[in-house]
Amino acid sequence: MSTDVETGHYSQSSQVENGAACIPDAISFSESKSSGARFAIMLSAIIIGVTAGTLFNTQMSPALTGMFLALTLVGGFLSTWSPCGYSSLSLLRPAGKYSLGSVARWTPTFITHAIGYAIGAVMLGGALGLVGAFLFEQLAFSHMVIGLAALSIAYGAHQLGFLRMPYPQRRAQVPHDARFRFRSSTIGLLYGYALGMNYLTYVQTPILYIVTGAALLSADVTTAITIIAIFNIGRCLPVAVNFLPVSNQSVQAWLAKWQERAVELDGFLLLSIGAAALTMLTL
């Protein structure tokens, strides 16, 4: 497998394990836009963010909360375009030909997968909340917003290729061989937990770093768990596509088609919301 996580490119060759072929994560991806087009995206994101910040300046608190919650949920969804996102959609599927019966038999797998995400949210969010309560309880709200907004803008520029930012992650996938050793529902739980912890596998979107920072700086265990849980809901929901009569090939092809656009959306959201937050604080 070869990967360039920071630019959103992935490829994985087919392998054979215990006589069963592993489905590649993707075959081909859409092409990146030119630097001029990416600069236009960056500029438009900043302009839209500044405009939104100006318009909602008198309602700063609810506006910031709404924008952050939207960013968190969408960030979880954008994590689908990672090696583990591809793998979960292709490996956690109903067995055999699609039918109401196969979907019913697969439903416990989806449920345990969601439970795994919930456990991950409690563990990661709880840890961040505890550390935050010890270190950042006295941090001013405005300072927190300024720090997260600046980080958001920096990573937005990173996603569009105009700035190099640190990208901490564990370069690992969920274990593919687990499907040869455990029943489907157990695999769903293991995958959900590994992905729900968010830092045990590849990090696709730097929105995760903003979400992590917000959970940490909230200095409250309940708030931190809620923040991570919202992100994990976005990560978990795409697997529900397997309730529909769609082939694995069509899902993988759709993901590959929109791979680069997902990275651009990532950068656009980070830039626009970061710019909006800074604008509201300065007016």
Predicted regions and their residues:
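Alpha-helical multi-pass membrane helix bundles of inner-membrane/thylakoid proteins
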Residues: 3-5, 10-34, 55-68, 101-103, ...
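Hydrophobic core of alpha-helical transmembrane segments in multi-pass integral membrane proteins
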Residues: 37-56, 271-278
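Helix-coil boundary and interhelical linker segments in multi-pass alpha-helical membrane proteins
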Residues: 59-69, 130-145, 213-226, 281-283
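Membrane-interface helix-loop-helix junctions at boundaries between adjacent transmembrane segments
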Residues: 65, 74, 94-119, 123, ...
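Hydrophobic cores of alpha-helical transmembrane segments in multi-pass inner/ER membrane proteins
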Residues: 74-90, 147-164, 234, 238-242, ...
